[in-house]
């Protein structure tokens, strides 16, 4: 025992360890008496070296324990709460070392003599429970005011540093890129480094100088012309240095190429306006920076004084965190907005110069005897498309076409693209108005209005008091701190490096294009054309998907070493919230969701471990998510070996996680569950994983609450049940019944009988799910037909194209009929909403309404007016909002848009209430996320807010607002409600689950 005590077991601070605990038989000390004295002691484990700890116990107990603890350097703000312990993980050691005042509570009692040795007091990192309680509940009360002030100062310095970085990210991105190309040019000349550059960098470097030269030439040309003969874009092309303008044009153009244009063509009007907008934004920042830079020799004394005062004012505002006021100073330096016509004219000329300057070179032959070939990287041409096959109505528009060599190399090096709207290092500005909030300097608007002036005017007119709850909700979503899950990112990178084509990742290789047959046989040639067309289509789709993956990964790589980051949110015109950053965000694919986690960690607790297991079962899916909670827990217990193998050996193990519907999210859940189960104190394990609670066909849930129909409410889990009700299975069962009945009819008199016989074995939940899901959002017969046709193609039973089309038509009609039978009340409300919209639109008014949170919504569907702009490249037709509303679109879009505004309202109400309850919250429309330990609290809140929302007379208020706004129009009465008691929702465990 003496030797054991002398050995002094230590804490192994290995950053990559995952709570690997080595335990021996131990007798825990009793909790200290409440009267015990305590003193503070500096935490040596913040210094990243081993801390020797040996056991002190009663004379009857002489066991010792050795623990290997996952290192957790100090985080941004170290506060210990009853249900919260900040994550110490993945922080810079330099910052960890600055925390000198962090405290450890040590009992001041006489040390126990054991075999002549003075035993040291023990530090318990996980057990026993009273120690956990001490750390999680009592520690914050024992930190004195001096220590709090010291930490506050540290946090302030750190925050100021992050804020300065954020300002640089937003204002100097293009400047840094220009400097990089200059440095690359210099290195290429001095060290011949060009062959080692990534494809995109090599390509941009080859374009940079020629494009810069032609822009400089154009600037001089326009400057020397008289005002009468100068081009319309002349005053604006001179506003930036040529090198910066060249970088913006290159990156914006390539960004458009990588944004999903499958055929490698971008519409001229889209490219021109996009470039024009980027130039205008940079001009505003450039003018301000230029005005406040160091003194010029020709400056008068007054000008020098003005510059100095302006610089001091802005620096002072930024230091005092008054970013909004600083931004106002910057904005005051600008001019009036340019407008689409100006943006298009300047953008078109810069596009023309890019086409002139940018070339690509095919690989040289082995012999090297042939003359190097250079081809234009971009070509301007006109494209003609028909509305549908066989139609005489054609549309002709200009496009910029990318060379195939450019497309081939682009998707392998997309990570070198500049992405301006990256996640923020500091919390976003609070929303206070239409354009007041979000990013610090980049243009931010509370709503994506897509040019609808009526919607913009409605938003600009609202007061902060009217829509303060909407602003609060967006601030809540924007203040949720995220970080990159490095474990999952590492797995993604390895799979991607190996060629993808697994876990939902696209194949990094193209499919081979079949060679043209030597035969002149027409049928053989036709077959080859069809095969080649199909292969080219697949390759274009793969190119687009590869670019998308690379853009997501490039952001993840950029942010992986950050302690945390934030996503400013804004709204679509219906009131649904979205992150403003477009690539790596939690509304995106399984890849993104698996790669992201909360920056703040919280202990699992008993409830959290329970919900973690259910969450894992939901992610695995395959029908498991439709079982009862007990059955899902049993599923996880039965696959614990697979789960642990997935966590410990995801690449070379059994790969059970790859069978999940959401593989990367499933793997992330496997990792944290394995950590918990291997810990001697699983409830104390810190989890950063967001746990989801999803609505059950949420659109129908909202309709059921509006109509108070008991049958429909039960079908979508507004009523408690032993297991989740599955509306998709119910619809598929009804479709099967109808088809079975049709199949018994005479095929001579009933053509659908033959189709019914074929389809009766094809009907399942998956066949009808998408149509049922989108029915409440206004899916048409044509939309339903296309959805079902895709599912039938996947099954592969019907291969004949004509038969497939006929089967899809029949299935769509039967599915929509079954929906109408089961959801009569919902259909009645949809029809009433559509009728009201038609009445309003027929009087040439767009449909307007106010959401329960005070957000004004205006449907933007008007007949567009074409505005022709003559540019140096071609005549551009800019679409702008007309004065005549589109009656058909106003009518068909109102029911789904209205329900979307209600589900957005429910999510925002829940977000604010969760924040007030101390929860971290993220929302994905009808999927609400929080820490595992807080799921029970969030579940209670989201149910209470749903009942609160629908206890208001929503349809009656809507009708009253229509009658007040349009007193000369006559509207039908609100459909009758059923007798469903909304309070039943509070007791339904599968309402969201």
From Swiss-Prot:
Recorded family membership: Belongs to the phage and mitochondrial RNA polymerase family.
GO cellular component term, pick one: DNA-directed RNA polymerase complex
Entry EC number(s): 2.7.7.6
Compartmental location: Plastid, Chloroplast
Protein name: DNA-directed RNA polymerase 3, chloroplastic
Gene Ontology terms describing biological process: DNA-templated transcription
Active-site residues, as the UniProt record annotates them: 694, 769, 926
Null allele phenotype: Reduced plant growth, impaired lateral root formation, rounded and pale-green leaves, protruding leaf laminae, irregular leaf margins and reduced seed sets.
Keywords: Chloroplast, DNA-directed RNA polymerase, Nucleotidyltransferase, Plastid, Transcription, Transferase, Transit peptide
